[in-house]
């Protein structure tokens, strides 16, 4: 079906990602998955990605082929990450942010009243990298309130947001 859609619509990132998802469901080898994934990003003019070996979920094995070209500006970017019961996913999200080509950043993990061990995970991540700060809201107030609390604490010239269950390409920022 995807090949047929490609003949009708040409190449597109959406079709390539659909091909990637289908290949995962078909349990294609890691090398095949890496080839498809690399092509998606190369076609978009971005650094290609691949999958690291292992048994972790695909999301946790995304990796870049080479280190991204470091950004030259020193403007601080604040990345606000609302966190609610995301202990299992938060490390992948934060590591993808810390691997950005733009290193002049702060990552604000705003714990929004999590009832799992998200706060402890966030605090552990903050001890591993000085660019990570934890803000504790105490009770669940919702993602918008968490983002607003992060904005009040942000020190960056530029501010962006990132969900606690997301992964970012190394050239996002």
Spell out what each predicted region is:
Residues 117, 166-173:
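Acidic donor-binding/catalytic loop of UDP-sugar-dependent glycosyltransferases
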Residues 112, 162-164:
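Active-site acidic Asp-centered loop
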Residues 95-104:
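Short, acidic, metal-binding catalytic loop of nucleotide-sugar glycosyltransferases
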Residues 159:
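Short aromatic/hydrophobic "clamp" motif used to bind/position activated sugar donors
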Residues 3-75:
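Non-catalytic membrane-proximal stalk/linker segments that position and tether the catalytic domains
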Residues 137-154:
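Glycine-rich, basic loop-to-helix element that forms the pyrophosphate-binding segment
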Residues 85-89, 114:
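Donor nucleotide-sugar binding loop of glycosyltransferases
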């Amino acid at each position: 079906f995807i090949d047929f859609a490609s003949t009708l619509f040409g190449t597109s990132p959406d079709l390539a990602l659909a091909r990637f998802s289908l290949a995962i469901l078909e349990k294609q080898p890691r090398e095949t998955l890496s080839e498809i994934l690399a092509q998606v990003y190369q076609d978009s003019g971005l650094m290609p990605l691949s999958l690291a070996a292992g048994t972790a979920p695909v999301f946790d094995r995304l990796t870049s082929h080479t280190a991204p070209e470091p950004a030259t500006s020193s403007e601080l970017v604040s990345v606000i990450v609302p966190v609610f019961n995301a202990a299992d996913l938060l490390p992948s999200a934060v590591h993808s942010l810390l691997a950005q080509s733009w290193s002049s950043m702060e990552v604000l993990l705003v714990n929004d009243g999590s009832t799992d061990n998200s706060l402890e995970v966030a605090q552990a991540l903050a001890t591993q990298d000085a660019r990570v700060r934890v803000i504790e809201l105490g009770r669940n107030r919702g993602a918008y309130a968490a983002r607003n609390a992060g904005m009040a604490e942000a020190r960056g010239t530029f501010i962006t947001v990132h969900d606690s269950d997301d992964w970012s390409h190394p050239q996002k920022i």
